[in-house]
Swiss-Prot record:
This is Ig kappa chain V region 4135. Residues 1-24 are annotated as: Framework-1. It comes from the Eukaryota. Residues 97-106 are annotated as: Framework-4. SUPFAM superfamilies: Immunoglobulin. It comes from Oryctolagus cuniculus. One of its GO terms (biological process) is adaptive immune response. Keywords: Adaptive immunity, Immunity, Immunoglobulin. Signal peptide: none annotated.
Length: 107
């Protein structure tokens, strides 16, 4: 059966310097085969984290991924205006993306 990715919340608004937590739940265990992506309007998705917790090259440590099995979390600390974007989780089994979380940063 296809793995269903459930991502929450759909949107979140926090001030500059704040912290955002995004959760992704899968309908069956995917071990740590989960990636997180950031997408800004008119741009392709940018990979942030792979294997649940490993930062992609050049991604600041303000971004942190955790979890395994069916429950995963992306935490963005010390929010900057440039972090305003939509964030997606994806199983690296290639079964599609979560529904996305729009992050609004209040400056």
């Amino acid at each position: 059966a296809d793995i269903v990715m459930t991502q929450t919340p759909a949107s979140v608004s926090e001030p500059v310097g704040g912290t955002v937590t995004i959760k992704c739940q899968t309908s069956q265990s995917i071990d740590d085969y989960l990636s997180w992506y950031q997408q800004k309007p008119g741009q392709p998705p940018k990979g942030l984290i792979y294997r649940a917790s490993t930062l992609a090259s050049g991604v600041p440590s303000r971004f942190r991924g955790s979890g395994s099995g069916t429950d995963f979390t992306l935490t963005i600390s010390d929010l900057e205006c440039a972090d305003a974007a939509t964030y997606y989780c994806q199983s690296t089994y290639g079964v599609g993306f979560g529904g996305g979380t729009e992050v609004v940063v209040k400056g």
